[in-house]
Regions:
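Membrane-interface helix-loop-helix junctions at transmembrane boundaries of multi-pass membrane enzymes
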Residues: 176-179, 268-275, 357-379, 530-534
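Transmembrane-helix motifs of polytopic, lipid-linked glycan transferases
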Residues: 155-178
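Interfacial juxtamembrane loops and adjacent helix segments
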Residues: 72-150
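Short acidic/glycine- and proline-prone juxtamembrane loop motifs at membrane-interface regions
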Residues: 200-208
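Short hydrophobic alpha-helices at membrane interfaces in multi-pass membrane enzymes
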Residues: 224-243, 247
Length: 535
């Protein structure tokens, strides 16, 4: 591909919502649509926030215990007790393991049993952080503690969702138009549906996913920006690094993986010294944080031991399990909750179709920089679980769940989708080449179908989560099943004194998702339409 001229470079780095020349979409209309898009995203996110009860995400009994009693527990005012001869902390009864996870793993039971616990009484729990996680997330989450455990957890979930929308929205707004579209497409596709579930939860994985992607996308965008935009993007990258380093040890390590990937993606020059310094410092801090936490060690302590097998047999077991492991990013075999919400069928198939469509589209504009940066991230995604399995002498990809590597999936998509940098007359990087969406009748129909599948998959994923906890597990046909019921008719669980019922939440959340993807698809194609009109 040849270099673009200065006029195209200027267009590529134009301000958000800038009108196209001649008959382009007016800036005012573009801004109004962008605002409506943000509102739709917020509404859809809040529907995910309230879709499941307290304790519903993996190991949430541990996370709520750590939220109430962050380390060091001896200095934070928590009441210390014992349970089964071990040191325990006192938490509201509704957060004790036997109550908050009373429905976990039991597909047939709703979350009704969780309503029997009291916020007034205290109970001991052995589930609290004693060095497995970095300092930061639990200390911040403790600020949300209040008398009502439901309100505390919902407030934290809502904050995490709004934090992701605010930080990533700022990056998208500050990035040049070509890269802005690539960033939004990457996270929209890679986070369907599991990413949305974790981002809107109280699990530290929320910060891990937001921080990891913010660090990667903001750093990449800042290398193609100038002035205040560049400064703002560097600040966003720093914020992402802080989130990654204060949430999980593995997400802190991901900063190093991203730094290596960006070294391939971004041409070296004196101009990127600030970004290079930030990425190197963040990588060093991330490795240090990971070395001081015990998350990786805790994974190695459990699993299907195959120590009696040969080394090559263990390699085979790990590598052969990778296809199912990777499909876990879209909920296959590893759905929400304590893996007790099944996404096999419609949801995992629909999300897989969207991912495959975007991967196929990205192949039309590959470059050696894209390939090497994507291989770097893909190597970490597949290599880390396999190496852990080999070191632990068991097929660890069945234990080291896909959600641990999910933060890197959106980064992988971004490395493939990001357009090449544009250059001005002096050869200096200035913005990005346009992000091209499929054109022509077939291209537009295909784009519309992919967007429709995305909206349908998101709606179905939200429905299944609500149904699981409101009614218990319901058998659905395979591989495609769109059967629904009135979620407010006979439901056994819902938030006490909630102003709206589960059916209203699902309908509003699903419609908001439809509106959001429709507006996003229209705005993504804006630059291409304008350029076609100019010729």
């Amino acid at each position: 591909m040849g270099e673009v001229g200065p006029q195209e470079a200027q267009s590529a780095s134009s301000t958000p919502g800038a009108p196209g020349r001649g008959r382009g979409t007016p800036a005012r209309s573009r801004y109004l649509l962008a605002v409506l898009l943000v509102v739709a995203v917020i509404v859809a996110s809040l529907a995910w926030v309230v879709s499941s009860p307290v304790g519903s995400s993996p190991d949430e009994d541990f996370h709520v215990g750590s939220m109430w009693c962050p380390p060091p527990v001896d200095e934070t005012g928590c009441q210390i007790s014992t349970k089964d001869g071990e040191k325990a902390v006192m938490v509201p009864q509704s957060l004790a393991k036997e109550y908050v996870t009373c429905y976990a793993f039991d597909h047939d039971n709703s979350a009704q049993c969780a309503l029997n616990a009291s916020d007034e009484e205290l109970a001991p729990t052995l589930r609290w952080d004693d060095g497995n996680y970095p300092w930061g997330y639990y200390q911040f989450a403790h600020l949300f503690v209040q008398h009502s455990t439901n309100r505390a957890v919902l407030a934290l979930r809502a904050f995490n969702a709004l934090l992701a929308i605010g930080l990533l929205g700022a990056i998208i707004a500050l990035a040049d138009s070509g890269l802005r579209r690539a960033i939004s497409v990457a996270l929209t596709v890679a986070w369907l549906p599991m990413g949305f579930y974790f981002i809107t939860g109280m699990n530290p994985s929320s910060w891990a996913m937001t921080g990891t992607f913010a660090f990667a996308s903001a750093l990449l965008a800042s290398t193609r920006s100038e002035g205040r935009r560049r400064a703002g993007l560097i600040a966003c990258a720093l914020a992402g690094a802080v989130l990654a380093c204060t949430s999980r040890g593995d997400s802190a390590f991901f900063l190093f993986v991203i730094t290596v990937a960006l070294a391939f993606a971004v041409p070296l020059s004196r101009r990127i010294v600030p970004e290079a310094c930030l990425s190197c410092v963040a990588s060093a801090v991330g490795i240090w944080v990971m070395s001081r936490t015990n998350v990786a060690a805790s994974h190695l302590a459990s699993g299907s031991d195959v120590s009696g097998e040969s080394w090559w047999r263990i390699v085979y077991l790990n590598v052969s399990a990778l296809p199912n492991y990777l499909r876990g990013f879209v909920g296959y075999l590893f759905g929400p909750g304590w893996n007790d919400v099944s996404y096999q069928g419609t949801v995992s198939s629909g999300a897989s179709l969207v991912v495959v469509a975007l991967l196929a589209w990205s192949l039309r504009s590959l470059s050696w920089r894209k390939v090497l940066s994507a291989i770097t991230v893909a190597g970490a995604i597949t290599g880390v679980p396999v190496v852990i399995g080999l070191r632990g002498h068991f097929n660890n990809v069945l234990v080291y769940q896909p959600r641990y590597m999910l933060p890197l999936f959106a980064v992988f998509m971004l490395m493939l989708l990001a357009p090449s940098p544009a250059r001005d007359e002096g050869g200096r990087s200035l913005g990005s080449r346009p992000f091209r969406v499929p054109q022509g009748v077939a291209g537009r129909v295909g784009t519309g179908l992919v967007a429709a599948v995305w909206a349908l998959t998101n709606a179905r994923a939200l429905y299944l989560v609500i149904e699981r906890y409101a009614f218990g597990h319901t058998a659905h046909g395979m591989p495609i099943d769109l059967s629904t019921r009135n979620l407010s008719d006979g439901n056994e669980w819902w938030w006490p004194n909630a102003p709206v019922g589960p059916m209203t939440v699902w309908v509003v959340g699903a419609l908001a998702g439809f509106v959001a993807i429709a507006l996003a698809a229209y705005l993504w194609g804006g630059v291409t339409r304008e350029r076609l009109q100019d010729h």
